[in-house]
């Protein structure tokens, strides 16, 4: 190996480990401090509305609603769902395009640090960051940040801003049905309104409420009381 190549790889390694160290320090800080913004907020085409609320102040059915709708294996996996990823890759091989298959942890990583769109580079970074979040933050913090940074409408981020916008009250006072109606927005928040649901979305809300009952009020208790 020539001196030039050794110099290039040495410089690349130096930059990489410095970047990873800075990333780890950032995640460590955000374990305790609410993120002042996110990459998705910075890229928003709309005025941003977001109000932080502690997960301890939310009714237990609000986090349960998003877990029931988005990631029922959230308490069990370590950031990524291998079965869902395998299924998505098989569908991609069949010509169906690259689908989501993202856990709540992956969605949190994406919303916080990455960019919209679906490609293998972003999905790879998303998975790597998800595992890092699980190791550094833990489940409760991941769920808390997700509930505060997920998009629920055009420029509306987090359940507190969403609750005030759609229901004119704090997320602290959301009912089971209202929580399920907010959760159903998550796959396509800019095209859905919890006060003007299509027949399909009303079915999804009913399904979500049924899943919440089946999972039970204690499903997330080991996480929320940690």
Swiss-Prot record:
InterPro entries linked to this entry: Glyco_trans_51 (IPR001264), Lysozyme-like_dom_sf (IPR023346), PBP_transglycosylase (IPR036950), Pep_trsgly (IPR011812)
EC code(s) of this entry: 2.4.99.28
Cellular component terms per the entry's GO annotation: peptidoglycan-based cell wall; plasma membrane
Key words, A-Z: Cell inner membrane, Cell membrane, Cell shape, Cell wall biogenesis/degradation, Glycosyltransferase, Membrane, Peptidoglycan synthesis, Transferase, Transmembrane, Transmembrane helix
Keyword Membrane: yes
Transmembrane region(s): 8-28
Highest taxon of the lineage: Bacteria
Subcellular location: Cell inner membrane
UniProt enzyme class: transferase
Membrane topology: Single-pass membrane protein
Name the UniProt record assigns to this protein: Biosynthetic peptidoglycan transglycosylase
Reaction(s) this enzyme catalyzes, per UniProt: [GlcNAc-(1->4)-Mur2Ac(oyl-L-Ala-gamma-D-Glu-L-Lys-D-Ala-D-Ala)](n)-di-trans,octa-cis-undecaprenyl diphosphate + beta-D-GlcNAc-(1->4)-Mur2Ac(oyl-L-Ala-gamma-D-Glu-L-Lys-D-Ala-D-Ala)-di-trans,octa-cis-undecaprenyl diphosphate = [GlcNAc-(1->4)-Mur2Ac(oyl-L-Ala-gamma-D-Glu-L-Lys-D-Ala-D-Ala)](n+1)-di-trans,octa-cis-undecaprenyl diphosphate + di-trans,octa-cis-undecaprenyl diphosphate + H(+)
Matching HAMAP family: PGT_MtgA
Pathway note: Cell wall biogenesis; peptidoglycan biosynthesis
One of the protein's GO biological processes: cell wall organization
Family label: Belongs to the glycosyltransferase 51 family.
Primary location class: membrane
Record Pfam families: Transgly (PF00912)
Function: Peptidoglycan polymerase that catalyzes glycan chain elongation from lipid-linked precursors.
Protein's gene: mtgA
GO molecular function ontology, one term from the record: pentosyltransferase activity
Keyword Ligase included in the entry's annotation: no
């Amino acid at each position: 190996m020539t001196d030039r190549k050794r110099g290039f790889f040495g410089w690349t390694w130096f930059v990489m480990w410095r970047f990873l160290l800075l990333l780890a320090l950032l995640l460590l800080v955000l374990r305790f401090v609410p993120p002042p913004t996110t990459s998705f907020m910075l890229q928003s085409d709309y005025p941003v509305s977001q109000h932080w609320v502690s997960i301890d102040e939310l009714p237990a059915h609000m986090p349960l609603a998003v877990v029931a709708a988005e990631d029922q294996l959230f308490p069990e996996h370590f950031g990524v769902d291998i079965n869902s990823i395998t299924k998505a890759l098989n569908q991609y091989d069949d010509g169906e395009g690259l689908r989501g298959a993202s856990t709540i942890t992956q969605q949190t990583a994406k919303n916080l640090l990455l960019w919209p769109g679906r490609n293998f580079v972003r999905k790879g970074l998303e998975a790597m960051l998800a595992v890092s979040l699980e190791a550094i933050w833990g489940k409760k913090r991941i769920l808390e940040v997700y509930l505060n940074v997920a998009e629920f409408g055009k420029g509306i981020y987090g359940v507190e801003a969403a609750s005030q916008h759609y229901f004119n009250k704090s997320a602290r006072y959301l009912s089971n049905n209202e929580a399920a109606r907010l959760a159903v927005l998550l796959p396509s928040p800019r095209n859905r309104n919890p006060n003007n649901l299509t027949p399909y979305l009303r079915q999804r809300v009913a399904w979500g409420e049924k899943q919440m009952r089946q999972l039970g009020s204690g499903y997330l208790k080991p996480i929320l009381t940690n």
